């Protein structure tokens, strides 16, 4: 079934059941192929770090597009995104997550300033925003951790949330040897409490970007998009019935 026709039909049946029994529920696919998953009945689809989307070109490669060295490329990502957008417009949402439990952390390849620019992109694109816990404070990928239940190389992206600057990061009162996965033990590990008190922190910037998105219909999930430039800077227009906004990511 190279075109996934049988799989699509199965999920269409599940969507029909869901609409009848749980009309307020939403289905989110982890396919990274919105041209198939949204037709299959999912309300939204994640782009993933593998497959044809070129999502990795933006954040997770030797020369990410959002790196200061400006040696990356968004061309193939934009081309793939536009193709999927044309196929799926009106059928559901294409979502670009900051990360998830299977990917390296954003902060593995990007510093704080670069992360701010990356979040400006993520929070000005169509689709529902998905921010993996801790990405909003720049939690790091922790190297060298013992694999837990098949985590292998993904384990470093699954460490406990860092709430404050206490020894346990505000995560648990348990002894550290009882933790499911070890904490980031770095002395300068970021935490939510400290960043909430800093106007120039990554968390504060993400909070401002979320508020700006919520205040502008063109930037929200269903606002339309058209790309003006796929080089440096990345330029696109977001439009709704109420407004048009030109986004320049530099």
What does each of the following model-derived ranges do?
Residues 1-9, 28-31, 43-45, 93-96, ...:
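Aromatic- and carboxylate-enriched substrate-binding clefts and catalytic-loop regions
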Residues 1-3, 14-16, 20, 37, ...:
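Substrate-binding/active-site clefts of carbohydrate-active enzymes
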Residues 5-11, 44-68, 158-160:
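Acidic, His- and aromatic-enriched active-site or binding-groove loops in soluble protein domains
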Residues 15-25, 32-33, 41, 49, ...:
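Loop/helix patches that line or flank the sugar-binding groove of alpha-linked glycan CAZymes
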Residues 22-24, 89-92:
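Short helix-terminating capping/connector loops at secondary-structure junctions
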Residues 67-91:
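Glycoside hydrolase catalytic-domain groove-lining segments
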Residues 246-250:
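Asparagine-centered strand-capping/turn motif at beta-strand->loop junctions
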């Amino acid at each position: 079934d190279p075109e996934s026709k049988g799989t699509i039909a199965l999920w269409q049946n599940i969507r029909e059941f869901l609409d009848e029994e749980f009309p307020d529920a939403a289905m989110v696919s982890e396919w990274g192929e919105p041209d198939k998953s949204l037709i299959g009945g999912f309300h939204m689809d994640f782009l993933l770090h593998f497959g044809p989307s070129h999502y990795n070109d933006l954040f997770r490669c030797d020369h990410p597009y959002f790196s200061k060295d400006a040696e990356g490329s968004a061309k193939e990502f934009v081309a793939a995104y536009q193709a999927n957008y044309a196929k799926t417009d009106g059928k559901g949402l294409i979502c670009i997550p900051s990360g998830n439990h299977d990917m390296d952390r954003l902060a593995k390849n990007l510093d704080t300033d670069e992360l701010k620019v990356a979040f400006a992109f993520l929070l000005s694109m169509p689709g529902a925003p998905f921010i993996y816990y801790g990405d909003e404070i720049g939690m790091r990928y922790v190297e060298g951790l013992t694999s837990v239940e098949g985590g292998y190389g993904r384990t470093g992206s699954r460490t406990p949330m860092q709430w404050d600057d206490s020894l346990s990061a505000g995560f648990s009162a348990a002894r550290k040897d009882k933790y499911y996965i070890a904490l980031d033990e770095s002395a300068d590990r970021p935490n939510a409490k400290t960043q909430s008190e800093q106007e120039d922190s990554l968390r504060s910037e993400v909070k401002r970007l979320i508020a700006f998105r919520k205040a502008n219909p063109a930037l929200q999930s269903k606002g339309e998009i058209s790309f003006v430039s796929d080089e440096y800077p990345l330029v696109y227009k977001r439009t709704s019935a109420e407004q048009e906004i030109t986004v320049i990511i530099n």
